[in-house]
């Protein structure tokens, strides 16, 4: 290029980097520079630019720092190598390489700044990935060693180059490295390890014509020796992090790397320690064979002296953290998290893995366990949580849990875990607001919802640790927990009795008592587990029972006035009773009396405020559930006093002000006793008729007329209410501005009295749920009980469905507008839904409830309560119908069910809100599809699913289009927002849409296609493709995919969901397509379905790959695209044609045809992905982003990633998921194709 051309380039760079440039001039200058990058001759220009000196810059009028020009020149090389290297002749390649090597070795100014060194390294990395051991062979290592022998900057450049190659090969999804992975691996091995080690490991030489150098010490030794220099250590440690997980362990031992790294961990500066601990983590967690020489190093790290040193480093790091200046970037805190994870992994990977355990000794198990205890005690709950999974696994391990060197930790483990049963999310408000724990929690977890989720899961882990510890040492645990009970519960009784106001959930005293009760619950669960696993020690069990009886007597004598404490006490007493009262009906009677007293706790006192009444009502509701739970746990003893219980409950029903829900729970209690007990089937059937018959009769007597919506509204008094409001208040008034006077309050009370006929609906649903639950206890009786229900359901279900139809009609805009101006206004106000959502609503939950209360003390109460009645009636109907579905054929054989169901739920779907749709999908549609017998699917599912899927698809597409036009407001991962209050409603609406979108995706993927997120994709695909070999009823997934009427709208919906900006939903949908695509593009598939996948779905996938929003999911999308291309080969070329139609690819001669040929020859999915990624990169379809590690071995200890790991570990083992004792009881769319 002549001098004028160079001057134009420099002037363009001036314009781009000048803050004074206008937008138009900057855009024009950038366009010139981009055109230069795309030019085949760009390397020659880059060479000219790099050969310019300061004087030449001045003469050409360049005002920029020379390093900016150097960086741009190197970017020309980088782009040209990426786009044109294959087109270069060997002479051109050698020319480029030689020039770059020369300036790297000779131009010290070029390497003086980091960003230029990094760009130069990137150029060498791109060349090496394409040409190392092609035309550029041993000379490459010679060049790197030449760099190493020069200055610090030269050594950094050599390390950057090698590290970049290793990371692209092993940590990043790099298509170029993937296509030459075998050659690059052997090339790296040849220079990392010493010549002597290589000859030992590869006596026949390395494959792929890679030579073993002569007398080469190898880069591992070279880096290891350089660790003694603090200036070089950082880059060397980074290189070790990139190779220690896969390089030969003989080379690691030869270079004495671990010893050097441990020395840095003990004595090095903080910034080196952080990288050193990453290296140690990689070493102790890497896969090793039983004869691996690295075991000696692992065992040495588990020696008492090494553990003592780790303990010292841990303590010193923890103490060095200044809590007042704590932040997510505090180096000491980052190191502490990495250190904690490494210590825990050291034991979890080696002590708790039955295969790895054979290679080490357990002599230091006690020292190690005490070190993990220190981690558990740390005030940071995030640090403490790192240890939890280790303890749960260790306590379940039959060898470790019984080892004498492990048992020494039990007393302190029990103490720490019990103390940490505290509800920290509430404690930080009043109990520990200024504590270190509160400060750590505030820094680690953002948002109310995230804090509650994390603390809840943290507490469940601690609960399980207490439970498992007790199940191993019951007697010792009993003595400690009884003493704790005396000090925590009984020791605070005086303060509790002196309280004149009810506790709140953040009250310090309540939280302290809650910890005590939770410890007791965990202990009782632990005792039960011990008894189930130990059947040969009745004497010890008898001692435990005697102590439990005396303990329970103390609890029974406690009389709390506070509703929240009463709830906790009742919960504990029910647990005690389930263990003790099988032989002690007196105790059972006392506990029953206490529960019934709580259920009938007076809530009418004039001294009670709104929050007080709420607490009492919540307590009564919880105690009703505890009563039913007692009936499930103790049906036989309760059956002995059934007549007395029924008499008491009948009296309560007649004499007290029980709500409909409370009546339902008491009747359910009686029903559960009769059906769960061991009396003979004839007696059970008699009680069934005795208990269910009156409820059915009551419902048939009180059920509203449902022939038309107006008839229904007349029955529930809407016209009368509207007339009353019209006469008393101005038209279209704001009723919250008018006081609820005595006359209006009396009228409202009469209206509410007339609405108490709801309870039989819910009661029948509860009875049916109990019948289905009893199937697991008395499976032989279930068929007979289904027959009893089969007689009842034809009398109940049709009218319930008709009632749902009329309810839905009340929400339909066309019906509302036809009621007249006044009535229309009132009904419209009644059905307005108000929500409070974590992280979205701009007010607290208590403020939301207070606002609702204010509505109820104004004239608006008439409207508000009417809307609440409609919602409650709808929920009861949904619940009852869903419960009946669990009976299977007994429900689905109701005459005319399919037509009635379709009419009820979809004839007025236009008025359903996002929340109502979500509720209907989750509560009704899912069980309807799951429980429908295979032989009735043509009758019950075939008419429903096409209409349902089309309606959902239309709803979601239209709502997302509207919200995208407005602009997204809610960050998926964010729980707190700083938006203005006037955006709250829009944000709530967007959140509700995300909920419906996710519910729809789960319905299709998990229910219809029967693909769960935890299933192996290969297993799912093989099971679907191999369905012809499976005997028995056709699976729902096969039925859905084999019916074109259903499959078409299903695939359309999934295709639309694939590009919605909601990562949770898209993750499910991508997983589903990965599973079903092999079947749907096979030769056996219908041609229309196959073409839909290869055209519409494939186009959506390419659009998603092009969308920066899906950056983190790019690998999965490319995988799906490869599966479509691969499985459709030889059947249809639609997907290939679509690729060839993309202008950015079609404009490049022979690019797509060459890709087709290589793709067809590719032997693995990894190679196919690399080929497709390279193709899309050539067309710049994949957005340019920072490289993302996909196989990184190092620890990401950002709070977000640590919380993700913690959430995964919450799902422990299958045993625990199915173990009732482990449950904590308080868990109530681009112009790309144009």
From Swiss-Prot:
Protein origin, superkingdom: Eukaryota
UniProt cross-references to SUPFAM superfamilies, sorted A to Z: ARM repeat (SSF48371)
InterPro entries xrefs: ARM-like, ARM-type_fold, Exportin-1/Importin-b-like, Exportin-5_C, XPO1/5
GO terms (BP aspect): protein export from nucleus; RNA export from nucleus
Transmembrane regions listed in the UniProt entry: none
GO CC list: cytoplasm; cytosol; nuclear envelope; nucleus; RNA nuclear export complex
One Pfam short name: Exportin-5
A GO MF term: nuclear export signal receptor activity
Name of this protein: Uncharacterized protein C328.01c
Organism: Schizosaccharomyces pombe (strain 972 / ATCC 24843) (Fission yeast)
């Amino acid at each position: 290029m002549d001098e004028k051309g160079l001057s134009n380039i420099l002037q363009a760079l001036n314009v781009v980097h000048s803050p004074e440039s206008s937008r138009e001039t900057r855009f024009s200058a950038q366009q010139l520079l981009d055109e230069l990058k795309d030019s085949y001759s760009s390397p020659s220009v880059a060479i000219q630019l790099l050969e310019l000196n300061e004087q030449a810059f001045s003469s050409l009028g360049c005002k920029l720092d020379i390093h900016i020009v150097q960086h741009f020149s190197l970017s020309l090389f980088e782009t040209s190598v990426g786009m044109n290297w294959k087109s270069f002749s060997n002479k051109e390649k050698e020319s480029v390489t030689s020039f770059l090597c020369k300036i790297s070795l000779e131009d010290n100014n070029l390497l003086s700044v980091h960003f230029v060194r990094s760009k130069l390294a990137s150029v060498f990395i791109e060349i090496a990935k394409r040409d190392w051991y092609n035309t550029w062979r041993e000379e490459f290592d010679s060049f790197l060693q030449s760099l190493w022998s020069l200055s610090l900057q030269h050594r950094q450049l050599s390390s950057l180059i090698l590290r970049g190659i290793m990371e692209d090969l092993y940590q990043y999804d790099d298509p170029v490295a993937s296509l030459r992975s075998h050659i690059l691996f052997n090339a790296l091995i040849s220079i990392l390890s010493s010549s002597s080690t290589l000859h030992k490991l590869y006596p026949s030489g390395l494959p792929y014509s890679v030579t073993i150098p002569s007398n080469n010490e190898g880069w591992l030794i070279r880096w290891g020796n350089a660790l003694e220099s603090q200036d070089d250590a950082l880059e060397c440690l980074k290189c070790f992090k990139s190779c220690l997980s896969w390089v030969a362990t003989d080379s690691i031992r030869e270079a004495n790397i671990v010893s050097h790294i441990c020395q840095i961990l003990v004595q090095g500066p903080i910034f080196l320690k952080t990288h050193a601990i990453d290296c140690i983590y990689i070493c102790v967690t890497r896969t090793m064979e039983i004869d691996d020489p690295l075991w000696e190093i692992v065992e040495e790290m588990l020696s008492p002296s090494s553990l003592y040193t780790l303990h010292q480093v841990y303590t010193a790091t923890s103490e060095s953290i200044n809590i007042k200046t704590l932040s997510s970037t505090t180096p000491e805190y980052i190191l502490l998290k990495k250190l904690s994870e490494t210590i825990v992994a050291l034991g979890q990977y080696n002590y708790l893995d039955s295969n790895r355990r054979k290679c080490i000794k357990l002599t230091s198990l006690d020292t190690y366990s005490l070190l993990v205890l220190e981690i558990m005690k740390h005030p940071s709950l995030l640090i403490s949580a790192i240890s939890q999974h280790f303890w749960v696994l260790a306590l379940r391990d039959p060898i470790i849990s019984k080892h004498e060197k492990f048992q020494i930790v039990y007393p302190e483990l029990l103490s720490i875990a019990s103390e940490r049963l505290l509800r920290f999310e509430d404690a930080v408000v009043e109990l520990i607001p200024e504590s270190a724990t509160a400060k750590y929690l505030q820094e680690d977890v953002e948002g109310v919802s995230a804090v509650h989720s994390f603390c809840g899961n943290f507490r469940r882990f601690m609960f399980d640790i207490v439970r498992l510890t007790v199940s191993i040492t019951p007697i010792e645990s009993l003595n400690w927990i009884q003493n704790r009970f005396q000090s925590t519960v009984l020791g605070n009784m005086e303060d509790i009795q002196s309280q004149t106001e009810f506790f709140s959930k953040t009250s310090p005293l309540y939280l302290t008592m809650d910890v005590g009760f939770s410890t007791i619950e965990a202990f009782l669960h632990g005792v039960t587990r011990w008894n189930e696993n130990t059947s040969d020690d009745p004497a010890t069990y008898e001692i435990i029972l005697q102590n439990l009886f005396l303990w329970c007597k103390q609890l029974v004598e406690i009389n709390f006035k506070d509703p929240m404490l009463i709830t906790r006490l009742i919960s504990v007493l029910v647990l005690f009773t389930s263990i003790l009262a099988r032989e002690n009906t007196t105790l059972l009677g006392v506990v029953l009396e206490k529960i019934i007293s709580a259920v009938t706790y007076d809530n009418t006192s004039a001294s009670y405020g709104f929050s007080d009444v709420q607490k009492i009502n919540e307590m009564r509701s919880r105690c009703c559930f505890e009563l039913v739970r007692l009936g499930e746990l103790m049906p036989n003893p309760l059956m002995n006093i059934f007549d007395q219980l029924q008499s008491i409950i009948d009296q309560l029903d007649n004499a007290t002000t029980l709500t409909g829900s409370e009546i339902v729970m008491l009747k359910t209690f009686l029903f559960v006793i009769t059906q769960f007990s061991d009396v003979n089937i004839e007696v059970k059937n008699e009680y069934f008729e005795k208990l269910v018959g009156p409820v059915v009769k009551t419902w048939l007597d009180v059920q509203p007329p449902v022939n038309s919506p107006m008839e229904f509204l007349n029955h529930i008094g809407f016209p009368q209410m509207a007339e009353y409001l019209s006469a008393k208040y101005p038209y279209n008034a704001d009723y919250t501005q008018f006081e609820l006077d005595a006359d209006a309050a009396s009228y409202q009370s009469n209206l509410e009295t007339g609405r108490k006929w709801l309870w039989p609906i819910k009661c029948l649903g509860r009875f049916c749920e109990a019948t289905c639950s009893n199937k697991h206890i008395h499976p032989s009786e279930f068929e007979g009980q289904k027959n009893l229900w089969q007689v009842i359901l034809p009398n109940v279900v049709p009218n319930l469905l008709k009632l749902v139809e009329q309810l839905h009609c009340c929400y339909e805009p066309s019906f509302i507008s036809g009621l007249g101006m006044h009535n229309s206004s009132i009904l419209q106000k009644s059905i307005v839904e108000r929500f409070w959502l974590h992280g979205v609503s701009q007010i607290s939950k208590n403020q939301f409830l207070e606002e609702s209360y204010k509505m109820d003390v104004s004239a608006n109460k008439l409207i508000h309560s009417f809307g609440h009645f409609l919602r409650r009636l709808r929920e009861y109907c949904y619940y009852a119908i869903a419960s009946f579905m669990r009976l299977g054929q007994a429900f689905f054989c109701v005459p005319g069910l399919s037509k009635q169901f379709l009419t009820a739920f979809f004839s007025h779907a236009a008025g359903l809100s996002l929340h109502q749709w979500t509720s209907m999908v989750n509560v009704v549609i899912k069980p309807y599809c799951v429980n429908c017998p295979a032989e009735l699917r043509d009758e019950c599912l075939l008419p429903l699913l096409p209409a349902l899927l089309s309606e959902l698809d239309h709803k979601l597409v239209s709502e997302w289009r509207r919200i995208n036009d407005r602009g997204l407001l809610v960050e998926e991962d964010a729980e707190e927002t700083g938006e203005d209050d006037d955006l709250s409603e829009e944000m709530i609406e967007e959140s509700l849409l995300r909920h419906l979108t996710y519910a729809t995706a789960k319905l299709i993927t998990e229910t219809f296609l029967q693909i769960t997120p935890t299933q192996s994709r290969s297993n799912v695909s093989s099971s679907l493709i191999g369905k012809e070999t499976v005997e028995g009823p056709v699976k729902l997934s096969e039925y859905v995919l084999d019916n074109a009427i259903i499959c078409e709208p299903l695939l359309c919906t999934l295709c639309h969901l694939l590009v919605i900006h909601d990562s949770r939903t898209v993750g499910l949908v991508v997983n589903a397509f990965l599973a079903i695509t092999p079947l749907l593009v096979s030769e056996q598939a219908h041609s229309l379905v196959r073409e839909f996948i290869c055209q519409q779905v494939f186009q959506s996938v390419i659009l998603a790959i092009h969308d920066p929003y899906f950056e983190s999911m790019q690998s999965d999308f490319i995988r799906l695209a490869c599966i479509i291309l691969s499985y459709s080969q030889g059947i249809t070329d639609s997907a290939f044609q679509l690729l060839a139609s993309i202008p950015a690819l079609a404009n490049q001669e022979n690019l797509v045809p060459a890709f087709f040929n290589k793709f067809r020859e590719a032997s693995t999915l990894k190679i196919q992905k690399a080929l497709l990624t390279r193709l899309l990169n050539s067309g710049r379809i994949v957005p340019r982003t920072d490289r993302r590690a996909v196989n990184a071995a190092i620890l990401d200890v950002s709070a977000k990633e640590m919380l993700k790991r913690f959430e995964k570990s919450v799902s422990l083992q299958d045993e625990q998921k199915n173990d009732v004792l482990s449950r904590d009881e308080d868990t109530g769319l681009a112009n790309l194709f144009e």
